[in-house]
């Protein structure tokens, strides 16, 4: 895969430039564009993934299905599809927006900061997973209700962005719609 960049943003969310992805994530990470996605299978189960230990930020942490950064000229929806293929080896239905204005800043235990405007999407998988071990060290298909109870009881066990997304009332309602069998 070619070198990825992040799209830097000003405080109003307007693009101001780009920076190589690995170099962008430091103790002083600048605001940049990202995305987050929650994937469901045909049984209505949520895919929860554990980040590979080689990840710069939050290594080994359980999180929602896939996250990443759109590249210049790429829509967030196309970026979701690209990263699902790369990280999970999976095809998905067109991503649906569930929390379009999500923005957060969080610092991991090693001092690496995430500082993102991060629209959140949900989709259904349409093929089997083929996990990229460089990105994901473990995964589990779970009932959404069980995951939400786990987040409510032990938020420290999950990525901060997953917790913030899951505790948004409107996002929970939209996620619940994906648990219904089609």
Curated annotation (Swiss-Prot):
Annotated GO biological process: dimethylallyl diphosphate biosynthetic process; isoprenoid biosynthetic process
Enzyme Commission designation = 5.3.3.2
Q: Which UniProt keywords apply?
A: Cytoplasm, Isomerase, Isoprene biosynthesis, Magnesium, Manganese, Metal-binding
**Residues binding Mg(2+):** 67, 87
PROSITE patterns of this UniProt entry?
A: NUDIX
Task: Give an example GO cellular component term for this record.
Answer: cytoplasm
Q: Which domain of life is it from?
A: Bacteria
Positions bound to Mn(2+): 25, 32, 69, 114, 116
Give the matching InterPro entries.
Idi_bact (IPR056375), IsopentenylPP_isomerase_typ1 (IPR011876), NUDIX_hydrolase-like_dom_sf (IPR015797), NUDIX_hydrolase_dom (IPR000086)
Substrates-to-products reaction catalysed:
isopentenyl diphosphate = dimethylallyl diphosphate
What's this chain's function? Catalyzes the 1,3-allylic rearrangement of the homoallylic substrate isopentenyl (IPP) to its highly electrophilic allylic isomer, dimethylallyl diphosphate (DMAPP).
**What is the designated name of this protein?**
Isopentenyl-diphosphate Delta-isomerase
What organism is the protein native to? Shigella flexneri
Lineage of the species this protein comes from: Bacteria, Pseudomonadati, Pseudomonadota, Gammaproteobacteria, Enterobacterales
């Amino acid at each position: 895969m070619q070198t990825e960049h992040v799209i830097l943003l000003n405080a109003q969310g307007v693009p101001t430039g780009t920076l190589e992805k690995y170099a962008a994530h430091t103790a002083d990470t600048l605001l940049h564009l990202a995305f987050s996605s929650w994937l469901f299978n045909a049984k209505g189960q949520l895919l929860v993934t554990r980040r590979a230990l080689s990840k710069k930020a939050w290594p080994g942490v359980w999180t929602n299905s896939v996250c990443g950064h759109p590249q210049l000229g790429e829509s967030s929806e196309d970026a979701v599809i690209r990263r699902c293929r790369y990280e999970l080896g999976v095809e998905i239905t067109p991503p649906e927006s569930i929390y379009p204005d999500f923005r957060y800043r969080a610092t991991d235990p090693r001092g690496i900061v995430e500082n993102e405007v991060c629209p959140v999407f949900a989709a259904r998988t349409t093929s089997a997973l083929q996990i990229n071990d460089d990105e994901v060290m473990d995964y589990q298909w779970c009932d959404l209700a069980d995951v939400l109870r786990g987040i409510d009881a032990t938020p420290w066990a999950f990525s901060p962005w997953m917790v913030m997304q899951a505790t948004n009332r409107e996002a929970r309602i939209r996620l619940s719609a994906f648990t219904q069998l089609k």
